[in-house]
Amino acid sequence: MRRALVLACLAPVAAWASPSMLNQIPTTDLVPEKQVSLQLQNGNTEVSGRSSLFHQPELMPQSEFGLPWNLEAGLDVAPSDPPHDYRPILNLKWTPVREDYRVPAIALGATQLGVGFDPNYFLVLSKTLNYQQIQYQKFRAHHRNIKLRGIRLHGGLLRTANAWRALVGTDAEVNDHFVIYADWISGAQNAVAVGGVFVIDKQNSIQASVLRGNVEDRVSGLILQVTHTFELAHPFEW
């Protein structure tokens, strides 16, 4: 989670992702309890202009912590205003309803909780299309990266400072080392994003995606990120 999601107040289109999100929208996923995910991502996604990723890269450290009671908390350090004025922001997610064969998982959350940022609030539902197959693989779960979750659909609502936005997305596990991500946020200043995750091993992955603004006729953004997940009891175990 993070300053994420959208950012309906920014132009050109900007977006952020995290271990428990797709390219730019939240899912019902949680970092497992007593685990931590660390991520490094570009804070600016523009591909052209003086403030583009290639001219003035802004690295953004991110972290998510798995907590009891189906909770996840995140602490990020994000560029505010001016862009190089980095400040901490908090993110929270709660999944009160877990998925089963018929019922989708449901999550509620808040992002961008910090001085200099406008908070966002979201409600999202996630449903695994091959749920039965994934259940059969549960015995392998502790050997698999948390991004490997089958074929799923996601939908929900995002409340920004001044508007409601629709969220739609999907992720499809191709094999044990590659997952396709695609998602969309409504609104003229938001985007559709398509990308994928290369899963290196249980703990590490690399994600890349391109964004096309809803009112653009070209690729308008690029997201690159590296993620490392580990257990708190064994922080140096690779």
Ranges and model annotations:
Residues 164-170:
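Short loop-to-alpha-helix "cap/lid" segments that border enzyme active sites
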Residues 4-6, 15:
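Cleavable N-terminal signal peptides
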